[in-house]
Design a protein with these regions (language model features):
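Active-site beta->alpha loop and helix N-cap motifs at the rims of alpha/beta catalytic domains
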Residues: 1-116
Length: 116
Protein backbone atom coordinates (compact mmCIF):
# COMPACT_ATOMS: atom_id res chain seq x y z
CA UNK A 1 0.00 0.00 0.00
CA UNK A 2 1.39 3.39 -1.01
CA UNK A 3 0.68 6.30 1.33
CA UNK A 4 2.41 8.96 -0.74
CA UNK A 5 0.47 11.90 -2.09
CA UNK A 6 -2.35 14.04 -0.79
CA UNK A 7 -5.18 12.55 1.28
CA UNK A 8 -8.08 14.95 1.76
CA UNK A 9 -9.78 14.93 5.16
CA UNK A 10 -13.37 15.21 4.03
CA UNK A 11 -16.42 16.60 5.85
CA UNK A 12 -19.45 14.40 6.39
CA UNK A 13 -22.52 15.81 4.62
CA UNK A 14 -25.82 15.91 6.49
CA UNK A 15 -29.32 17.08 5.63
CA UNK A 16 -31.98 17.39 8.35
CA UNK A 17 -29.67 15.64 10.84
CA UNK A 18 -29.33 12.58 8.58
CA UNK A 19 -26.37 11.45 6.48
CA UNK A 20 -26.54 12.78 2.94
CA UNK A 21 -24.92 9.94 1.03
CA UNK A 22 -25.93 11.44 -2.31
CA UNK A 23 -23.99 14.60 -1.48
CA UNK A 24 -21.06 12.44 -0.40
CA UNK A 25 -21.08 10.67 -3.78
CA UNK A 26 -21.32 14.02 -5.60
CA UNK A 27 -18.42 15.46 -3.60
CA UNK A 28 -16.30 12.36 -4.18
CA UNK A 29 -16.96 12.50 -7.92
CA UNK A 30 -15.60 16.06 -7.98
CA UNK A 31 -12.63 15.23 -5.75
CA UNK A 32 -11.75 12.18 -7.87
CA UNK A 33 -11.24 14.56 -10.82
CA UNK A 34 -8.13 15.77 -8.98
CA UNK A 35 -4.84 14.02 -8.26
CA UNK A 36 -5.74 13.08 -4.68
CA UNK A 37 -4.18 9.82 -3.53
CA UNK A 38 -7.24 9.20 -1.39
CA UNK A 39 -9.49 10.53 1.32
CA UNK A 40 -9.83 10.40 5.08
CA UNK A 41 -13.45 9.76 6.04
CA UNK A 42 -14.49 10.34 9.67
CA UNK A 43 -11.20 11.97 10.52
CA UNK A 44 -10.87 14.74 13.06
CA UNK A 45 -13.10 17.05 10.98
CA UNK A 46 -15.41 14.31 9.70
CA UNK A 47 -17.98 14.35 12.50
CA UNK A 48 -17.05 10.89 13.74
CA UNK A 49 -18.44 11.66 17.19
CA UNK A 50 -21.84 12.50 15.69
CA UNK A 51 -22.46 9.24 13.83
CA UNK A 52 -23.27 5.80 15.18
CA UNK A 53 -21.49 2.61 14.14
CA UNK A 54 -23.96 1.77 11.37
CA UNK A 55 -23.73 5.28 9.93
CA UNK A 56 -19.93 5.08 10.02
CA UNK A 57 -20.12 1.78 8.12
CA UNK A 58 -22.41 3.40 5.53
CA UNK A 59 -20.08 6.36 5.06
CA UNK A 60 -17.04 4.17 4.58
CA UNK A 61 -18.82 1.75 2.23
CA UNK A 62 -20.27 4.62 0.19
CA UNK A 63 -16.87 6.28 -0.12
CA UNK A 64 -15.22 3.02 -1.16
CA UNK A 65 -17.86 2.25 -3.79
CA UNK A 66 -17.70 5.79 -5.20
CA UNK A 67 -13.94 5.78 -5.66
CA UNK A 68 -11.57 3.89 -7.93
CA UNK A 69 -9.67 1.08 -6.22
CA UNK A 70 -6.45 2.96 -7.03
CA UNK A 71 -7.43 5.66 -4.51
CA UNK A 72 -7.23 4.87 -0.81
CA UNK A 73 -9.97 5.26 1.78
CA UNK A 74 -8.59 5.93 5.24
CA UNK A 75 -11.17 5.80 8.03
CA UNK A 76 -10.96 7.61 11.33
CA UNK A 77 -11.47 4.90 13.95
CA UNK A 78 -10.12 6.43 17.16
CA UNK A 79 -12.54 6.04 20.07
CA UNK A 80 -12.52 6.64 23.82
CA UNK A 81 -11.15 3.19 24.66
CA UNK A 82 -8.78 0.68 23.12
CA UNK A 83 -11.54 -1.93 22.86
CA UNK A 84 -13.89 0.47 21.05
CA UNK A 85 -11.06 1.57 18.75
CA UNK A 86 -10.23 -2.02 17.80
CA UNK A 87 -13.91 -2.74 17.14
CA UNK A 88 -14.30 0.41 15.01
CA UNK A 89 -11.14 -0.42 13.07
CA UNK A 90 -12.37 -3.93 12.28
CA UNK A 91 -15.77 -2.58 11.21
CA UNK A 92 -14.06 -0.01 8.98
CA UNK A 93 -12.01 -2.74 7.29
CA UNK A 94 -15.17 -4.79 6.73
CA UNK A 95 -16.86 -1.71 5.21
CA UNK A 96 -14.02 -1.26 2.73
CA UNK A 97 -11.47 1.03 4.36
CA UNK A 98 -7.92 0.47 3.17
CA UNK A 99 -6.38 1.83 6.37
CA UNK A 100 -7.34 3.53 9.59
CA UNK A 101 -6.47 6.83 11.22
CA UNK A 102 -6.44 6.48 14.99
CA UNK A 103 -6.40 9.65 17.06
CA UNK A 104 -5.87 9.49 20.79
CA UNK A 105 -8.64 9.73 23.33
CA UNK A 106 -10.32 13.12 23.39
CA UNK A 107 -11.04 13.09 27.11
CA UNK A 108 -8.94 15.60 29.01
CA UNK A 109 -7.57 13.43 31.79
CA UNK A 110 -4.19 15.12 32.03
CA UNK A 111 -3.85 18.01 34.45
CA UNK A 112 -2.41 21.35 33.37
CA UNK A 113 0.76 20.45 35.29
CA UNK A 114 1.15 17.18 33.36
CA UNK A 115 0.78 18.99 30.05
CA UNK A 116 3.60 21.44 30.79
Amino acid sequence: MNFSGVFAPIPTPFVDDELDLGALRDNLARWMETDLAGIVVLGTNGESAQVNDNEADELIATARSAMPESRLVIAGTGRESTRATVTATRRAADAGADASFVSTCGAGWASAWELV
